[in-house]
Protein backbone atom coordinates (compact mmCIF):
# COMPACT_ATOMS: atom_id res chain seq x y z
CA UNK A 1 0.00 0.00 0.00
CA UNK A 2 1.13 3.55 -0.62
CA UNK A 3 -0.41 6.71 0.79
CA UNK A 4 0.08 10.28 -0.38
CA UNK A 5 -1.36 12.99 1.83
CA UNK A 6 -1.42 16.74 1.23
CA UNK A 7 -3.45 19.02 3.49
CA UNK A 8 -6.88 17.46 3.84
CA UNK A 9 -6.45 15.10 0.85
CA UNK A 10 -5.34 11.47 0.72
CA UNK A 11 -4.18 9.33 -2.18
CA UNK A 12 -4.23 5.61 -1.52
CA UNK A 13 -3.05 2.93 -3.87
CA UNK A 14 -1.58 -0.53 -4.08
CA UNK A 15 1.17 -1.72 -6.36
CA UNK A 16 4.83 -1.42 -7.31
CA UNK A 17 7.16 1.55 -6.98
CA UNK A 18 6.56 2.49 -10.60
CA UNK A 19 2.78 2.31 -10.18
CA UNK A 20 3.04 4.51 -7.10
CA UNK A 21 5.06 7.12 -9.00
CA UNK A 22 2.57 7.10 -11.88
CA UNK A 23 -0.37 7.49 -9.50
CA UNK A 24 1.36 10.38 -7.78
CA UNK A 25 2.02 12.12 -11.10
CA UNK A 26 -1.62 11.71 -12.12
CA UNK A 27 -2.78 13.13 -8.81
CA UNK A 28 -0.44 16.11 -9.26
CA UNK A 29 -1.78 16.77 -12.75
CA UNK A 30 -5.35 16.75 -11.40
CA UNK A 31 -4.48 19.12 -8.60
CA UNK A 32 -4.88 16.56 -5.82
CA UNK A 33 -1.41 17.11 -4.39
CA UNK A 34 1.26 19.72 -4.70
CA UNK A 35 4.60 18.87 -6.28
CA UNK A 36 7.21 17.97 -5.33
CA UNK A 37 5.74 15.10 -3.29
CA UNK A 38 6.71 11.50 -2.71
CA UNK A 39 4.59 8.45 -1.89
CA UNK A 40 4.92 6.97 1.58
CA UNK A 41 4.72 3.20 1.96
CA UNK A 42 2.41 2.04 4.74
CA UNK A 43 0.88 -1.16 6.07
CA UNK A 44 -2.84 -1.77 6.48
CA UNK A 45 -2.36 -1.24 10.23
CA UNK A 46 -0.60 2.09 9.65
CA UNK A 47 -3.42 3.28 7.44
CA UNK A 48 -6.09 2.31 9.96
CA UNK A 49 -4.21 4.06 12.76
CA UNK A 50 -3.72 7.20 10.69
CA UNK A 51 -7.37 7.41 9.70
CA UNK A 52 -8.46 7.11 13.34
CA UNK A 53 -5.88 9.66 14.47
CA UNK A 54 -7.16 12.18 12.00
CA UNK A 55 -10.77 11.71 13.10
CA UNK A 56 -10.32 13.10 16.62
CA UNK A 57 -12.73 15.92 17.56
CA UNK A 58 -12.09 18.25 20.48
CA UNK A 59 -14.51 20.86 21.85
CA UNK A 60 -13.37 23.37 24.47
CA UNK A 61 -15.88 25.31 26.56
CA UNK A 62 -14.11 28.43 27.86
CA UNK A 63 -16.13 30.87 29.96
CA UNK A 64 -14.64 34.38 30.25
CA UNK A 65 -11.85 33.90 27.71
CA UNK A 66 -12.44 37.57 26.93
CA UNK A 67 -12.38 40.11 29.78
CA UNK A 68 -15.98 41.21 30.47
CA UNK A 69 -15.32 44.89 31.20
CA UNK A 70 -14.54 46.74 27.97
CA UNK A 71 -13.63 49.90 29.90
CA UNK A 72 -10.41 48.24 31.09
CA UNK A 73 -8.62 48.92 27.83
CA UNK A 74 -5.17 47.75 28.95
CA UNK A 75 -6.24 44.28 30.05
CA UNK A 76 -4.63 42.60 27.00
CA UNK A 77 -1.49 44.75 26.97
CA UNK A 78 1.81 42.82 26.84
CA UNK A 79 0.07 39.44 26.81
CA UNK A 80 1.97 37.05 24.54
CA UNK A 81 -0.66 34.65 23.17
CA UNK A 82 0.53 33.56 19.70
CA UNK A 83 -1.09 30.10 19.83
CA UNK A 84 -4.48 31.30 21.08
CA UNK A 85 -4.53 34.22 18.65
CA UNK A 86 -3.52 31.89 15.82
CA UNK A 87 -6.36 29.48 16.58
CA UNK A 88 -8.95 32.25 16.87
CA UNK A 89 -7.75 33.87 13.65
CA UNK A 90 -7.61 30.72 11.51
CA UNK A 91 -11.00 29.41 12.59
CA UNK A 92 -14.48 30.19 11.34
CA UNK A 93 -16.49 32.15 13.89
CA UNK A 94 -20.19 32.15 14.75
CA UNK A 95 -21.72 34.57 17.23
CA UNK A 96 -24.62 33.89 19.57
CA UNK A 97 -26.48 35.35 22.52
CA UNK A 98 -25.37 35.46 26.13
CA UNK A 99 -25.56 32.11 27.94
CA UNK A 100 -24.29 31.04 31.33
CA UNK A 101 -22.24 27.85 31.67
CA UNK A 102 -25.11 25.88 33.21
CA UNK A 103 -27.53 26.85 30.45
CA UNK A 104 -24.96 25.99 27.76
CA UNK A 105 -24.24 22.58 29.29
CA UNK A 106 -27.91 21.68 29.73
CA UNK A 107 -28.74 22.68 26.18
CA UNK A 108 -25.73 20.80 24.78
CA UNK A 109 -26.84 17.61 26.53
CA UNK A 110 -30.43 17.91 25.32
CA UNK A 111 -31.91 19.21 28.58
CA UNK A 112 -34.77 21.68 28.18
CA UNK A 113 -35.30 24.52 30.60
CA UNK A 114 -38.11 23.88 33.06
CA UNK A 115 -39.13 26.68 35.39
CA UNK A 116 -35.38 26.92 36.01
CA UNK A 117 -32.52 25.08 34.38
CA UNK A 118 -32.83 21.77 36.33
CA UNK A 119 -29.32 21.75 37.75
CA UNK A 120 -30.26 20.40 41.20
CA UNK A 121 -31.74 17.01 40.20
CA UNK A 122 -28.86 16.43 37.75
CA UNK A 123 -26.00 17.21 40.15
CA UNK A 124 -27.75 15.32 42.96
CA UNK A 125 -26.58 11.94 41.68
CA UNK A 126 -23.02 13.11 41.10
CA UNK A 127 -22.98 14.30 44.72
CA UNK A 128 -23.84 10.79 45.86
CA UNK A 129 -27.63 10.74 46.19
CA UNK A 130 -29.53 8.11 44.23
CA UNK A 131 -33.05 9.36 43.49
CA UNK A 132 -35.41 6.75 44.90
CA UNK A 133 -39.12 6.16 44.60
CA UNK A 134 -39.88 8.47 47.52
CA UNK A 135 -37.96 11.54 46.39
CA UNK A 136 -38.91 12.03 42.75
CA UNK A 137 -39.98 15.52 43.70
CA UNK A 138 -38.82 18.96 42.75
CA UNK A 139 -35.20 19.36 43.77
CA UNK A 140 -33.70 22.75 44.50
CA UNK A 141 -30.12 23.80 45.16
CA UNK A 142 -29.74 25.80 48.38
CA UNK A 143 -26.05 26.68 48.42
CA UNK A 144 -24.28 28.44 51.30
CA UNK A 145 -23.04 31.92 50.36
CA UNK A 146 -21.48 34.99 51.91
CA UNK A 147 -23.23 38.36 51.71
CA UNK A 148 -21.45 41.64 52.33
CA UNK A 149 -22.29 45.31 51.91
CA UNK A 150 -20.31 47.35 49.41
CA UNK A 151 -21.32 50.79 48.15
CA UNK A 152 -24.89 50.45 49.45
CA UNK A 153 -25.29 47.09 47.71
CA UNK A 154 -25.63 43.64 49.22
CA UNK A 155 -23.13 41.60 47.19
CA UNK A 156 -22.96 37.80 47.01
CA UNK A 157 -19.82 35.65 47.11
CA UNK A 158 -19.90 31.91 46.45
CA UNK A 159 -17.68 29.09 47.70
CA UNK A 160 -14.88 29.99 45.29
CA UNK A 161 -13.83 32.73 47.72
CA UNK A 162 -14.36 30.95 51.03
CA UNK A 163 -13.77 27.51 52.50
CA UNK A 164 -16.44 25.48 54.25
CA UNK A 165 -15.70 22.05 55.71
CA UNK A 166 -18.07 19.07 55.81
CA UNK A 167 -18.34 19.47 59.59
CA UNK A 168 -19.30 23.14 59.25
CA UNK A 169 -21.90 22.34 56.59
CA UNK A 170 -23.37 19.64 58.84
CA UNK A 171 -23.50 21.97 61.84
CA UNK A 172 -25.23 24.77 59.95
CA UNK A 173 -27.80 22.57 58.19
CA UNK A 174 -28.60 20.78 61.45
CA UNK A 175 -29.38 24.14 63.06
CA UNK A 176 -31.55 25.18 60.11
CA UNK A 177 -33.41 21.86 59.99
CA UNK A 178 -34.07 22.02 63.73
CA UNK A 179 -35.63 25.46 63.31
CA UNK A 180 -37.87 24.49 60.38
CA UNK A 181 -38.88 21.07 61.78
CA UNK A 182 -42.08 22.43 63.32
CA UNK A 183 -42.98 25.47 61.24
CA UNK A 184 -42.13 24.08 57.79
CA UNK A 185 -40.89 20.45 57.89
CA UNK A 186 -40.67 20.24 54.09
CA UNK A 187 -37.72 22.63 54.24
CA UNK A 188 -34.95 20.18 55.11
CA UNK A 189 -31.43 21.00 53.96
CA UNK A 190 -29.31 18.12 52.67
CA UNK A 191 -25.56 18.96 52.62
CA UNK A 192 -24.38 16.33 50.14
CA UNK A 193 -21.30 18.48 49.51
CA UNK A 194 -20.04 21.23 51.83
CA UNK A 195 -20.69 23.87 49.17
CA UNK A 196 -23.77 22.26 47.57
CA UNK A 197 -26.92 21.84 49.64
CA UNK A 198 -30.27 20.51 48.44
CA UNK A 199 -33.99 20.70 49.26
CA UNK A 200 -36.68 18.35 47.93
CA UNK A 201 -40.09 20.02 47.54
CA UNK A 202 -43.33 18.05 47.49
CA UNK A 203 -46.09 20.55 48.31
CA UNK A 204 -44.53 24.00 48.53
CA UNK A 205 -44.74 25.80 45.16
CA UNK A 206 -41.19 26.13 43.80
CA UNK A 207 -39.65 29.51 43.05
CA UNK A 208 -38.30 30.88 39.81
CA UNK A 209 -34.68 31.71 40.39
CA UNK A 210 -31.49 33.06 38.90
CA UNK A 211 -28.46 30.82 38.43
CA UNK A 212 -25.86 31.26 41.14
CA UNK A 213 -23.31 32.13 38.44
CA UNK A 214 -25.52 35.04 37.37
CA UNK A 215 -25.50 36.54 40.86
CA UNK A 216 -21.85 36.18 41.90
CA UNK A 217 -20.35 39.55 42.90
CA UNK A 218 -23.63 41.31 42.12
CA UNK A 219 -26.29 42.99 44.23
CA UNK A 220 -28.85 40.37 45.22
CA UNK A 221 -31.90 42.55 45.89
CA UNK A 222 -32.99 42.62 42.24
CA UNK A 223 -32.14 38.93 41.72
CA UNK A 224 -34.13 37.26 44.48
CA UNK A 225 -36.68 34.50 43.68
CA UNK A 226 -39.56 35.69 41.53
CA UNK A 227 -42.86 34.42 40.15
CA UNK A 228 -46.11 33.46 41.87
CA UNK A 229 -44.43 31.99 44.97
CA UNK A 230 -41.80 34.71 45.30
CA UNK A 231 -43.23 36.00 48.60
CA UNK A 232 -42.74 32.62 50.30
CA UNK A 233 -39.18 32.23 49.07
CA UNK A 234 -38.09 35.78 49.81
CA UNK A 235 -39.35 35.27 53.34
CA UNK A 236 -37.32 32.04 53.57
CA UNK A 237 -34.28 33.87 52.20
CA UNK A 238 -34.54 36.48 54.96
CA UNK A 239 -35.33 33.92 57.67
CA UNK A 240 -32.35 31.69 56.88
CA UNK A 241 -30.14 34.75 56.75
CA UNK A 242 -31.11 35.75 60.30
CA UNK A 243 -30.71 32.19 61.57
CA UNK A 244 -27.24 31.77 60.07
CA UNK A 245 -26.13 35.14 61.41
CA UNK A 246 -26.85 33.92 64.96
CA UNK A 247 -24.91 30.66 64.68
CA UNK A 248 -21.88 30.24 67.01
CA UNK A 249 -19.92 28.84 64.08
CA UNK A 250 -20.03 32.22 62.37
CA UNK A 251 -18.63 33.90 65.48
CA UNK A 252 -15.70 31.48 65.28
CA UNK A 253 -15.23 32.17 61.57
CA UNK A 254 -15.35 35.91 62.20
CA UNK A 255 -12.71 35.63 64.93
CA UNK A 256 -10.50 33.68 62.52
CA UNK A 257 -10.94 36.23 59.74
CA UNK A 258 -12.94 33.86 57.54
CA UNK A 259 -16.00 35.07 55.58
CA UNK A 260 -19.28 34.36 57.36
CA UNK A 261 -21.64 31.75 55.94
CA UNK A 262 -24.57 34.10 56.40
CA UNK A 263 -27.06 33.25 53.65
CA UNK A 264 -28.35 30.63 51.24
CA UNK A 265 -28.96 30.98 47.52
CA UNK A 266 -31.92 29.04 46.13
CA UNK A 267 -31.47 28.13 42.46
CA UNK A 268 -31.40 25.45 39.75
CA UNK A 269 -34.70 23.79 40.62
CA UNK A 270 -36.49 21.10 38.65
CA UNK A 271 -37.42 17.46 38.30
CA UNK A 272 -35.04 14.88 36.90
CA UNK A 273 -35.08 14.98 33.05
CA UNK A 274 -36.37 11.84 31.38
CA UNK A 275 -33.51 11.54 28.90
CA UNK A 276 -30.09 12.91 28.07
CA UNK A 277 -28.32 13.02 24.72
CA UNK A 278 -24.80 13.84 23.66
CA UNK A 279 -22.34 13.16 20.86
CA UNK A 280 -19.42 13.34 23.29
CA UNK A 281 -17.73 10.13 24.34
CA UNK A 282 -15.47 11.75 26.93
CA UNK A 283 -16.02 14.81 29.14
CA UNK A 284 -13.11 16.48 30.93
CA UNK A 285 -13.49 19.07 33.66
CA UNK A 286 -14.01 19.86 37.32
CA UNK A 287 -17.39 21.55 36.90
CA UNK A 288 -19.91 19.46 38.85
CA UNK A 289 -22.67 19.87 36.24
CA UNK A 290 -20.39 18.67 33.43
CA UNK A 291 -19.45 15.66 35.55
CA UNK A 292 -23.11 14.93 36.35
CA UNK A 293 -24.21 15.21 32.71
CA UNK A 294 -21.47 12.83 31.58
CA UNK A 295 -22.58 10.38 34.26
CA UNK A 296 -26.23 10.66 33.21
CA UNK A 297 -25.65 10.09 29.49
CA UNK A 298 -23.10 7.30 29.85
CA UNK A 299 -20.05 9.23 28.66
CA UNK A 300 -16.68 8.85 30.34
CA UNK A 301 -15.63 11.63 32.69
CA UNK A 302 -12.18 12.65 33.87
CA UNK A 303 -10.89 15.47 36.02
CA UNK A 304 -9.37 18.32 34.06
CA UNK A 305 -5.74 17.46 33.20
CA UNK A 306 -2.96 19.97 33.67
CA UNK A 307 -2.28 20.21 29.95
CA UNK A 308 -3.73 19.32 26.57
CA UNK A 309 -1.07 16.73 25.73
CA UNK A 310 -2.87 14.25 28.01
CA UNK A 311 -5.74 14.12 25.52
CA UNK A 312 -3.33 13.09 22.78
CA UNK A 313 -2.96 9.71 24.44
CA UNK A 314 -6.69 8.90 24.45
CA UNK A 315 -8.68 6.98 21.86
CA UNK A 316 -8.32 8.94 18.61
CA UNK A 317 -11.88 8.28 17.51
CA UNK A 318 -13.36 9.94 20.62
CA UNK A 319 -15.28 13.18 20.65
CA UNK A 320 -14.07 15.15 23.65
CA UNK A 321 -15.66 18.01 25.57
CA UNK A 322 -13.28 19.92 27.83
CA UNK A 323 -14.60 22.51 30.30
CA UNK A 324 -11.80 25.04 30.86
CA UNK A 325 -13.25 27.29 33.56
CA UNK A 326 -10.02 28.66 35.09
CA UNK A 327 -10.85 32.19 33.99
CA UNK A 328 -14.49 32.44 35.05
CA UNK A 329 -13.96 33.00 38.76
CA UNK A 330 -11.25 35.59 38.18
CA UNK A 331 -13.46 37.52 35.76
CA UNK A 332 -16.54 37.27 37.99
CA UNK A 333 -14.68 38.84 40.91
CA UNK A 334 -12.89 41.44 38.76
CA UNK A 335 -9.47 39.95 39.50
CA UNK A 336 -7.66 41.32 36.45
CA UNK A 337 -4.20 40.19 37.57
CA UNK A 338 -5.36 36.66 38.36
CA UNK A 339 -7.24 36.48 35.05
CA UNK A 340 -4.14 37.50 33.07
CA UNK A 341 -1.94 34.98 34.90
CA UNK A 342 -4.47 32.19 34.32
CA UNK A 343 -4.65 33.07 30.63
CA UNK A 344 -0.86 32.82 30.37
CA UNK A 345 -1.04 29.34 31.90
CA UNK A 346 -3.73 28.30 29.42
CA UNK A 347 -1.59 29.55 26.55
CA UNK A 348 1.38 27.49 27.72
CA UNK A 349 -0.35 24.26 28.71
CA UNK A 350 -3.37 24.20 26.39
CA UNK A 351 -3.33 26.51 23.41
CA UNK A 352 0.29 25.92 22.37
CA UNK A 353 -0.07 22.10 22.32
CA UNK A 354 -3.46 22.33 20.59
CA UNK A 355 -2.12 24.71 17.95
CA UNK A 356 0.64 22.19 17.19
CA UNK A 357 -1.80 19.26 17.10
CA UNK A 358 -4.09 21.02 14.62
CA UNK A 359 -1.18 22.12 12.46
CA UNK A 360 0.23 18.57 12.36
CA UNK A 361 -3.15 17.09 11.44
CA UNK A 362 -3.53 15.24 14.73
CA UNK A 363 -6.93 16.85 15.30
CA UNK A 364 -9.66 16.67 12.69
CA UNK A 365 -11.55 19.51 14.33
CA UNK A 366 -11.01 21.83 17.28
CA UNK A 367 -13.90 23.99 18.46
CA UNK A 368 -13.65 26.76 21.05
CA UNK A 369 -16.95 27.89 22.58
CA UNK A 370 -16.29 31.17 24.36
CA UNK A 371 -18.94 32.36 26.82
CA UNK A 372 -18.94 36.02 27.74
CA UNK A 373 -20.99 38.86 29.15
CA UNK A 374 -21.25 40.53 25.73
CA UNK A 375 -22.26 37.37 23.86
CA UNK A 376 -20.94 33.93 23.02
CA UNK A 377 -18.68 32.99 20.11
CA UNK A 378 -17.83 29.62 18.55
CA UNK A 379 -14.48 29.28 16.76
CA UNK A 380 -14.13 26.13 14.63
CA UNK A 381 -10.66 25.20 13.37
CA UNK A 382 -9.77 22.31 11.06
CA UNK A 383 -6.33 21.17 10.04
CA UNK A 384 -6.66 22.60 6.55
CA UNK A 385 -7.47 26.04 7.97
CA UNK A 386 -3.88 26.43 9.10
CA UNK A 387 -2.83 26.85 5.44
CA UNK A 388 -5.29 29.66 4.78
CA UNK A 389 -2.69 32.40 4.67
CA UNK A 390 -5.31 35.07 3.98
CA UNK A 391 -6.65 34.58 7.50
CA UNK A 392 -3.97 36.66 9.16
CA UNK A 393 -3.36 36.44 12.88
CA UNK A 394 -5.15 39.17 14.82
CA UNK A 395 -4.67 40.15 18.48
CA UNK A 396 -7.08 38.80 21.08
CA UNK A 397 -8.57 42.27 21.59
CA UNK A 398 -9.97 42.16 18.04
CA UNK A 399 -11.69 38.82 18.66
CA UNK A 400 -13.08 40.08 21.98
CA UNK A 401 -14.95 42.99 20.36
Residue spans of the language-model regions?
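Short aromatic-glycine-(Arg/Gly/Cys) micro-motifs in beta-strand/loop hairpins
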Residues: 1-7
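Loop-centered beta-sheet repeat module
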Residues: 204-275
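Extended, Lys/Arg-enriched charged tracts that mediate electrostatic binding to polyanionic substrates
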Residues: 163-191, 247-258, 262-263
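An N-terminal, globular interaction/scaffold subdomain
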Residues: 74-169, 175
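Soluble secreted/lumenal catalytic domains
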Residues: 43, 132-133, 169-172, 179, ...
Amino acid sequence: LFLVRDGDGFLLGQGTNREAEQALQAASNDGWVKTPARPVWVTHEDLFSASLHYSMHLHLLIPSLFWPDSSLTGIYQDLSLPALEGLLSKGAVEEGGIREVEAWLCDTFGIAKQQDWPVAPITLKADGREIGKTDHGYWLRADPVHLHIERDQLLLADSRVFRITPAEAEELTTALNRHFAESCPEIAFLPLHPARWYICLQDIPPPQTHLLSEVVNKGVRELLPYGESSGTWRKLFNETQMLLHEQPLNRVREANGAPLINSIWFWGGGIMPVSFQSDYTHVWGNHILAQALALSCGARHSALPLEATVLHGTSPSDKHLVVLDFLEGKASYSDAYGWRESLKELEKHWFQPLFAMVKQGKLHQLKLSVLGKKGNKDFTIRSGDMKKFWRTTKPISVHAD
